[in-house]
């Protein structure tokens, strides 16, 4: 195939992110300067985000048999880039007093972002695997970045070993699927599934192994055991990246796969397996979060439940399913960045461990009322309370479930949401209690004048605005025609 200017434009976000990575690497090799490195990263990610505007003018376009850039890919590229941008902004103040080399964190984050961009535009199992590894491998280093802290090192080792096992399952599953189908392209697999050619035991084992690999990356039950430990041990900005960009990219490619091969969900075994995983993730995630006194662990278990809610829309996979997932992921990214942003500010500058214990937030309202308001809005949004962005996402998922008559899943979703309400309210109540005598962590006095603080206030206002008036988000989803090309 001939490479035209349209192909070049379609790859702009990925090319700009990769170029930023190289420039940052050369800048670090020339002279270490933390602020300069962070600024370069922010400029590069902003340019990559702006480059999506010309990309929309040439979509849908198949750049290679491996990569398809359409409106669907553009929407999720934007979510990945916004998540990365927020994490870089939060990391700058957080890393100011870090005793080791600070600049490499930005290199790893940019590399993982490039992997996320490849993943959301994948239309072939080979590009799915390449994107997934390009996303996962830098995260190993990011999780263990604060290696002076034993928990961070332990989290890094745990995530590396289990992630490698998940990738091995995924790769072996792909090999079995290829042996039976003779194709690795999503469209080719979709055609084979529609013709009912893929029905042997090898296919069942292959799909099962792929489900294990992707289930690990999405921290779905029963592949979730790493999640709370890794969220707790990783530096706060890295936990934010794991909860947002990493999950968005993997779920986007999984949804694309099922949208191109919708007949796969007609397979009773696969449908039942996904339904059981969804119910288990919703109930276990919420029930295990009830007992947590560590906010990062609580948000880790909460993310398991949220991915369970998203599986409901994936299983429905018709009507508004793609739009529902888009709305839910956009609102989930917004609120997760806000919640982890507050934890990051409370832990800034780095002092050996993060402010993740619930008692450290006791009476925060009396010291930092605006920061408390931000955290309150985030908790309400994660709980799916009306007038917050989270409610719109949950409403869409329930609507899709009702449309597809998935009554058991809707029941689990409602029950899970009711349980979730308790532990989100517990965090909120703690913020307004009487201050304790001993205080270990607190946000910097001038937190509201820093880039991270300004961003957090903007996120809280946006979460409230979208809850009251969600039309702009819905119009973006409809105008971008959040439908899959091909």
UniProtKB/Swiss-Prot annotation:
Compartment(s) where it occurs, according to its Swiss-Prot or TrEMBL record: Cell inner membrane
A GO molecular function held by the record: NADH:ubiquinone reductase (non-electrogenic) activity
Class of enzymatic activity (EC top level): translocase
GO terms under cellular component: plasma membrane
Pfam family, one: Proton_antipo_M
EC number: 7.1.1.-
Bilayer topology term: Multi-pass membrane protein
Reaction catalyzed: a quinone + NADH + 5 H(+)(in) = a quinol + NAD(+) + 4 H(+)(out)
TM stretches of this protein: 8-28, 38-58, 73-93, 105-125, 128-148, 169-189, 196-216, 235-255, 269-289, 304-324, 325-345, 373-393, 405-427, 454-474
PANTHER family: NADH DEHYDROGENASE (PTHR22773)
Assembly and interaction partners: NDH-1 is composed of 13 different subunits. Subunits NuoA, H, J, K, L, M, N constitute the membrane sector of the complex.
Function: NDH-1 shuttles electrons from NADH, via FMN and iron-sulfur (Fe-S) centers, to quinones in the respiratory chain. The immediate electron acceptor for the enzyme in this species is believed to be ubiquinone. Couples the redox reaction to proton translocation (for every two electrons transferred, four hydrogen ions are translocated across the cytoplasmic membrane), and thus conserves the redox energy in a proton gradient.
Protein name in UniProt: NADH-quinone oxidoreductase subunit N
Gene transcribed to yield this protein: nuoN
């Amino acid at each position: 195939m001939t490479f035209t200017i349209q192909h070049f434009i379609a790859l702009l976000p990925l090319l700009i992110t990769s170029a930023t990575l190289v420039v940052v690497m050369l800048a670090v090799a020339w002279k270490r300067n933390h602020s300069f490195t962070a600024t370069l990263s922010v400029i590069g990610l902003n340019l990559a985000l702006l480059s999506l505007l010309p990309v929309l003018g040439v979509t849908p376009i198949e750049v290679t048999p491996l990569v398809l850039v359409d409106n669907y890919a553009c929407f999720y590229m934007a979510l990945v880039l916004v998540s990365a941008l927020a994490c870089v902004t939060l990391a700058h103040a957080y890393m100011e007093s870090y005793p080791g080399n600070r600049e490499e964190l930005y290199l790893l984050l940019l590399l993982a972002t490039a992997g996320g961009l490849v993943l959301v535009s994948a239309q072939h199992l080979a590009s799915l695997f390449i994107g997934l590894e390009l996303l996962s491998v830098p995260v190993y280093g990011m999780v263990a970045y604060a290696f002076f802290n034993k928990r961070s090192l332990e989290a890094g080792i745990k995530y590396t070993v289990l992630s490698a096992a998940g990738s091995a399952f995924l790769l072996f599953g792909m090999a079995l699927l290829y042996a039976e189908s003779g194709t690795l392209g999503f469209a080719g697999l979709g055609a084979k599934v529609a013709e009912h050619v893929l029905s042997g035991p090898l296919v069942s084992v292959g799909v099962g192994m792929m489900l294990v690999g992707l289930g690990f990356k999405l921290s779905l039950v029963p592949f979730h055991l790493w999640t709370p430990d890794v969220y707790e041990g990783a530096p706060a900005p890295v936990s934010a990246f794991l909860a947002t960009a990493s999950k968005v990219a993997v779920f986007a490619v999984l949804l694309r796969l099922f949208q191109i091969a919708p007949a796969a969900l007609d397979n009773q075994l696969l449908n039942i397996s996904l339904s059981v995983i969804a119910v288990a993730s919703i109930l276990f995630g919420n029930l295990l979060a009830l007992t947590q006194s560590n906010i990062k662990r609580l948000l880790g278990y909460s993310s398991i439940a949220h991915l369970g809610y998203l599986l409901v829309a994936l299983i429905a996979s018709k009507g508004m399913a793609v739009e529902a997932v888009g709305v839910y992921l956009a609102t989930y990214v917004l609120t997760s960045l806000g919640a982890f942003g507050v934890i990051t500010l409370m832990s800034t500058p780095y002092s050996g461990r993060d402010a993740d214990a619930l008692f450290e937030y006791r009476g925060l309202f009396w010291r930092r009322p605006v920061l408390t308001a931000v955290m309150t809005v985030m908790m309400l949004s994660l709980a799916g309370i009306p007038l917050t962005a989270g409610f719109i996402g949950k409403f869409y998922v329930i609507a899709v479930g009702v449309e597809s008559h998935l009554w058991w899943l809707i029941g689990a979703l409602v029950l899970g949401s009711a349980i979730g309400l308790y532990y989100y309210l517990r965090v909120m109540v703690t913020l307004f209690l009487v201050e304790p005598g001993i205080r270990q962590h607190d946000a910097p006095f001038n937190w509201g004048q820093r880039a991270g603080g300004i961003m957090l206030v903007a996120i809280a206002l946006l979460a409230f605005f979208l809850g009251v008036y969600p039309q702009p988000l819905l119009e973006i989803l409809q105008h971008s025609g959040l439908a899959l090309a091909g």
